[in-house]
């Protein structure tokens, strides 16, 4: 794992850094575990933009990831660590003893040839998956379920990790990467270890074109728009905002405004809010 920088042969190269991909051992994905991915350009079924700044980018094939980790009692061998264009973490190709192949999110430190397992009472070892009630307090975990059997939904991005803080009856306390401490059902599964690709946060994009390769379109300032497009738009020359404070494109306060819905059902599971 490392970061590669370049000589300033052009303005775009001057600040650019890329990952060295030292952990990646295979360049072509397993054919049986990929499906075609249709681009949406951030539009919904009616053709309206629902997510701004999306569109273009390199073609991708979706890798089918096993988030459930429900193959109990059958050990699997790590056959390869691969790059996945659909996520920031690396993925690991697992060959199970019964012949099945699956992809999982690769934890930091997992290597080709390692044996991983999932089940009720497997060893507390990087890459193993088991219910939260059987994981010791203080253990670093990732790929955490919110509903038993649904598959991991939390802590899946590159370099992230959560920590099991305490156990209270049918629930356990987990400290999330954001600092939030929340209750999760003890029957939910999690995987031991931290997510791979720790250096992802240190990569500098370097130039606008590289964002376009990733399918990210430019973010235009509201003050550069027309009044019909943004509350900050319009005016002659560089006009002030014209409001007591900055607003979102939909007219809501942009600063200091709590966007979480009040009285949400999951509020009772949050012991301490993120900072």
UniProtKB/Swiss-Prot annotation:
Region of interest: Disordered: 224-275
CC per GO annotation: large ribosomal subunit
Keyword Mitochondrion: no
GO MF term (any one): transferase activity
Family: Belongs to the universal ribosomal protein uL2 family.
PANTHER family: LARGE RIBOSOMAL SUBUNIT PROTEIN UL2M, RIBOSOMAL PROTEIN L2
GO biological process assignments: cytoplasmic translation
TM stretches of this protein: none
Gene behind this protein: rplB
The organism's taxonomic lineage, starting at the top: Bacteria, Bacillati, Bacillota, Clostridia, Thermoanaerobacterales
Annotated Basic and acidic residues bias: 264-275
Protein name stated in the entry: Large ribosomal subunit protein uL2
Function, in words: One of the primary rRNA binding proteins. Required for association of the 30S and 50S subunits to form the 70S ribosome, for tRNA binding and peptide bond formation. It has been suggested to have peptidyltransferase activity; this is somewhat controversial. Makes several contacts with the 16S rRNA in the 70S ribosome.
Keywords: Ribonucleoprotein, Ribosomal protein, RNA-binding, rRNA-binding
